[in-house]
Amino acid sequence: MTTLRAFTCDDLFKFNNINLDPLTETYGIPFYLQYLAHWPEYFIVAEAPGGELMGYIMGKAEGSVAREEWHGHVTALSVAPEFRRLGLAAKLMEMLEEISERKGGFFVDLFVRVSNQVAVNMYKQLGYSVYRTVIEYYSASNGEPDEDAYDMRKALSRDTEKKSIIPLPHPVRPEDIE
């Protein structure tokens, strides 16, 4: 039976099998520790019965309440290749959405590579829609051009009029993101 639990510092030494995917953004240990210290409830791991890590989600709460922009943000979601197509990503997303609801968020958002159609389709099936395109959001490392991202959003119950998911008509640049 899969266990969904809070991510711990010890998990930093056990999740390399998940981060080997070329579409998974990886960060230095201080970055993960910052999230663990500031937003521990948004950092969740899926663990197999034998203790092997199957996947994780890392996020945060951010934005302005006054401007109805307080929201949950998915910084990273990844499932190890051998545990894909089991519904783990959907379950992890559901947990982050529930936490964001409890925190009074208007929506949940995330960024995904335009080329990652498997992920884009999964997010659409989970109720997310493309809010805007962010030009050259992802830096290329091998001489390839930088890649655009979709900023995808799902309105939560606090956004009764669904204003947070009305798509922007034009793409934006990374420096224009608040």
Curated annotation (Swiss-Prot):
InterPro entries (alphabetical): Acyl_CoA_acyltransferase (IPR016181), GNAT_dom (IPR000182), NatB_acetyltransferase_subunit (IPR051646)
Keyword Plastid among UniProt keywords: no
Entry-linked CDD domains: NAT_SF
Keyword Transferase applies: yes
Catalysed reactions listed for this entry: N-terminal L-methionyl-L-asparaginyl-[protein] + acetyl-CoA = N-terminal N(alpha)-acetyl-L-methionyl-L-asparaginyl-[protein] + CoA + H(+); N-terminal L-methionyl-L-glutaminyl-[protein] + acetyl-CoA = N-terminal N(alpha)-acetyl-L-methionyl-L-glutaminyl-[protein] + CoA + H(+); N-terminal L-methionyl-L-aspartyl-[protein] + acetyl-CoA = N-terminal N(alpha)-acetyl-L-methionyl-L-aspartyl-[protein] + CoA + H(+); N-terminal L-methionyl-L-glutamyl-[protein] + acetyl-CoA = N-terminal N(alpha)-acetyl-L-methionyl-L-glutamyl-[protein] + CoA + H(+)
Domain of life (superkingdom): Eukaryota
Pfam family membership, one: Acetyltransf_1
GO-annotated biological processes: N-terminal peptidyl-aspartic acid acetylation; N-terminal peptidyl-glutamic acid acetylation; N-terminal peptidyl-glutamine acetylation; N-terminal protein amino acid acetylation; regulation of actin cytoskeleton organization
Localization per Swiss-Prot or TrEMBL: Cytoplasm; Nucleus
Annotated GO CC locations: cytoplasm; NatB complex; nucleus
Record-level Gene Ontology MF annotations: protein N-terminal-methionine acetyltransferase activity; protein-N-terminal amino-acid acetyltransferase activity
Positions of the N-acetyltransferase domain: 2-157
EC number annotated for this UniProt entry: 2.3.1.254
Main localisation: cytoplasm
Keywords of the record: Acyltransferase, Cytoplasm, Nucleus, Transferase
SUPFAM superfamilies, per database record: Acyl-CoA N-acyltransferases (Nat) (SSF55729)
Oligomer and partners: Component of the N-terminal acetyltransferase B (NatB) complex which is composed of naa20 and naa25.
The family this protein is said to belong to: Belongs to the acetyltransferase family. ARD1 subfamily.
PANTHER family, A to Z: N-ALPHA-ACETYLTRANSFERASE 20
Described purpose of this protein according to its UniProt entry: Catalytic subunit of the NatB complex which catalyzes acetylation of the N-terminal methionine residues of peptides beginning with Met-Asp, Met-Glu, Met-Asn and Met-Gln. Proteins with cell cycle functions are overrepresented in the pool of NatB substrates. Required for maintaining the structure and function of actomyosin fibers and for proper cellular migration.
Protein name, UniProt field: N-alpha-acetyltransferase 20
Organism: Danio rerio
Gene: naa20
